[in-house]
From Swiss-Prot:
GO terms for cellular component: nucleus; RNA polymerase II transcription regulator complex. Residues 255-318 form the bZIP domain. Its main location: nucleus. This is D site-binding protein. Belongs to the bZIP family. PAR subfamily. Residues 283-297 are annotated as: Leucine-zipper. Expressed in the suprachiasmatic nuclei (SCN) and in most peripheral tissues, with a strong circadian rhythmicity. Residues 1-98, 124-203, 230-255 are annotated as: Disordered. GO terms for biological process: liver development; positive regulation of transcription by RNA polymerase II; regulation of transcription by RNA polymerase II; rhythmic process. Binds DNA as a homodimer or a heterodimer. Can form a heterodimer with TEF. The keyword Cell membrane does not apply. It is found in: Nucleus. SMART domains: BRLZ. It comes from Rattus norvegicus (Rat).
């Protein structure tokens, strides 16, 4: 028969006894209560709760790294529970996240520093000729002090050799060539002279098609005022020829020989007039082109002189500050 709820009293622990009892008495009381049948098995939830409370009261080992201190009494011993007996309110070193450490994406990596300068690009930018290769055909290796040490990444293997960026390889060779160029600065090769006839001025010149037709020989190539060159003999002034006195020939003397001679003279005079007019037309069209080209070149000369005066002023200030080159 089941007992009423009022008669059910919790049985003593098997291994524990009342306070003040002799050691070993708890075991006898537990055995007696087990034989009498009035003991009740423990619930698993209560056992787990007591085990957590027992672990919470034990002092925890300090964890290396940044820790967070919880609020509590300053004179409380290690492992003491504060805040109404709650195990979560105890004071002492508690492991926590490193809130004061910089984030990974906020770190500044030294990859934006400029280590090398392309000397040829610098010289071309300032209108100077590029540096010639050093004698021997081999450029000296760059100084090891200026070579940045490669930083191994997280996915790099120990057997892989460090590789430099492709943009720095030609810059290092240029830097080595610059060292040999500074040593032989006085023996720099001057640029080869340019043929003035091959230089073309960028300009818009459109002559009249009728003038070009009058300046061209029929059946031949069209006259080009940009490329045509006259010889010194053609440009010499022609003397004025005096017209011969006209001789009156009587009608009875105008025979067949006279008319053939007159015909040949007229044809020769016509050819001479046509050649002279053709040459005059060519010279006039060529002169119009040269006048326009000359005006454009004068403007370029003025701009070049202004730029030259500016560079001379910069050079004089540099020499006054750093001495003669």
């Amino acid at each position: 028969m089941a007992r009423p709820l009022s008669d059910r009293t919790p049985g003593p622990l098997l291994l524990g006894g009342p306070a003040g009892a002799p050691p070993g008495g708890g075991a006898l009381l537990g055995l007696r209560s087990l034989l009498q049948g009035n003991s009740k098995p423990k619930e698993p939830a209560s056992c787990l709760l007591k085990e957590k409370e027992r672990k919470a009261t034990l002092p925890s080992a300090p964890v290396p790294g940044p820790v967070l201190e919880t609020a509590g009494p300053a004179d409380a011993p290690t492992g003491a529970v504060s805040g109404g007996g709650s195990p979560r309110g105890r004071s002492g070193p508690v492991a926590g996240p490193s809130l004061f450490a910089p984030l990974l994406w906020e770190r500044t990596l030294p990859f934006g520093d400029v280590e090398y300068v392309d000397l040829d690009a610098f010289l071309l930018e300032h209108g100077l000729p590029p540096s010639p290769p050093p004698p021997g055909g081999l450029s000296p290796a760059p100084s090891p002090a200026r070579t940045p040490a490669p930083s191994p990444g997280p996915g790099s293997c120990s057997s892989s050799s460090p590789r430099s960026s492709p943009g720095h390889a030609p810059a290092r060779a240029t830097l080595g060539a610059a060292g040999g160029h500074r040593a032989g600065l006085t023996s720099r090769d001057t640029p080869s002279p340019v043929d003035p006839d091959t230089v073309e001025v960028l300009m818009t010149f459109e002559p009249d098609p009728a003038d070009l037709a009058l300046s061209s020989i029929p059946g031949h190539e069209t006259f080009d005022p940009r490329r045509h060159r006259f010889s010194e003999e053609e440009l010499k002034p022609q003397p004025i020829m005096k017209k011969a006195r006209k001789v009156q020939v009587p009608e009875e003397q105008k025979d067949e020989k006279y008319w053939s001679r007159r015909y040949k003279n007229n044809e020769a005079a016509k050819r001479s007039r046509d050649a002279r007019r053709l040459k005059e037309n060519q010279i006039s069209v060529r002169a119009a082109f040269l006048e326009k080209e000359n005006a454009l070149l004068r403007q370029e000369v003025v701009a070049v002189r202004q730029e030259l005066s500016h560079y001379r002023a910069v050079l004089s200030r540099y020499q006054a500050q750093h001495g003669t080159l």
